[in-house]
């Protein structure tokens, strides 16, 4: 018989840098997860993606064992890295802070494709372009 999921915990943690310190430790402790076991496994799995923020969904079972799925980094993080800026615009409709090309948007869309509910690469690119515009980025050809 399959184990019954008791809780789902969603976190965004820098790749390879999960520690028992807040906010990771308390979130896992409340769910009854072995914190050191999770941090070691997460850091090992994400060591090759250093510098990125990785969303993770942790399934906690009734016997307090757990499994987790790592997702692709958020589109905003990938866009900031591509544009080389620290943060987006506070007033995106008035102040444009960076420019990204369609080629960069396409690369980000290809990376994000498994996590997006887009039927095609073009649809995924439109989603990423929308995120870029809402951050105060200009999309150019």
UniProtKB/Swiss-Prot annotation:
SMART domains hit by this protein: RL11
Pfam families linked to this entry: Ribosomal_L11, Ribosomal_L11_N
Cellular component, GO, one term: cytosolic large ribosomal subunit
Protein family (similarity comment): Belongs to the universal ribosomal protein uL11 family.
HAMAP family reported for this sequence: Ribosomal_uL11
Summary of subunit composition and partner proteins: Part of the ribosomal stalk of the 50S ribosomal subunit. Interacts with L10 and the large rRNA to form the base of the stalk. L10 forms an elongated spine to which L12 dimers bind in a sequential fashion forming a multimeric L10(L12)X complex.
Full protein name: Large ribosomal subunit protein uL11
Originating species: Streptococcus suis (strain 05ZYH33)
Record lineage: Bacteria, Bacillati, Bacillota, Bacilli, Lactobacillales
């Amino acid at each position: 018989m399959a184990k019954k999921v008791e809780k789902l915990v969603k976190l965004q943690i820098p790749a390879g840098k999960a520690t028992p310190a807040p906010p990771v430790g308390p979130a896992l402790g409340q769910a009854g997860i072995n914190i050191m076991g999770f941090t070691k496994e997460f850091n090992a799995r994400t060591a090759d993606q250093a510098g990125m923020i990785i969303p993770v969904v942790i399934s906690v079972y009734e016997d307090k064992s757990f499994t987790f799925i790592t997702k692709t980094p958020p589109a905003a993080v990938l866009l900031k890295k591509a544009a080389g800026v620290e943060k987006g615009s506070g007033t995106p409709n008035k102040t444009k802070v960076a420019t990204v090309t369609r080629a960069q948007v396409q690369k980000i869309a290809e990376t994000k494709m498994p996590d997006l509910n887009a039927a095609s690469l073009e649809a995924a690119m439109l989603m990423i372009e929308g995120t870029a515009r809402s951050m105060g980025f200009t999309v150019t050809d």
